[in-house]
């Protein structure tokens, strides 16, 4: 009887470790995906500058880009900050943003966001990427905009030339 109690206790104690290892593997997979999907190429405070800021990854860009005829867009904060990032978004809302281009309020993301390239991501990879984004240290960083074509822009930006 004593052996059964010891085995049962050991099994119960190992469950949190197994869950922790699975969660770590999920976040690690998500970090890999964020890297190959080049999320930091835009959603970084040093994006579009000679010196990217790697201390606050994916906390949004302070340099925007203009899409002629559409406006100026600043890549937003993807950290789990509740005020300026994705902290109030559900897993489903985050996944809909990068697979369907939909914001929680129903508006579409800027066309420069390559969500169509990510629309066929597997459900497991979508959850991994979301787990990684949620694992980041929250950074309060309110990026400017977006700005319509006739609005005054309050930050530096690049102009994109669309193919003809």
Task: Put a short name on every predicted segment.
Residues 1-8:
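Bacterial N-terminal signal peptides that target proteins for export
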Residues 13-21:
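C-terminal segment of classical bacterial N-terminal signal peptides
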Residues 66-96:
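Mid-chain, structured segments of secreted extracytoplasmic proteins
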Residues 41:
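Short, cysteine/histidine-rich loop/knuckle motifs that typically chelate Zn2+
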Residues 6, 27, 91, 123-126:
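Short functional linear motifs
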Residues 25, 35-36, 44-73, 104-164:
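Flexible coil segments in periplasmic/lumen-exposed cytochrome c-class electron-transfer proteins
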Residues 83-89, 96-102, 115-118, 130-131:
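A structural feature that tracks compact, well-ordered secondary-structure segments
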Residues 22-32:
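Cleaved targeting-peptide boundary
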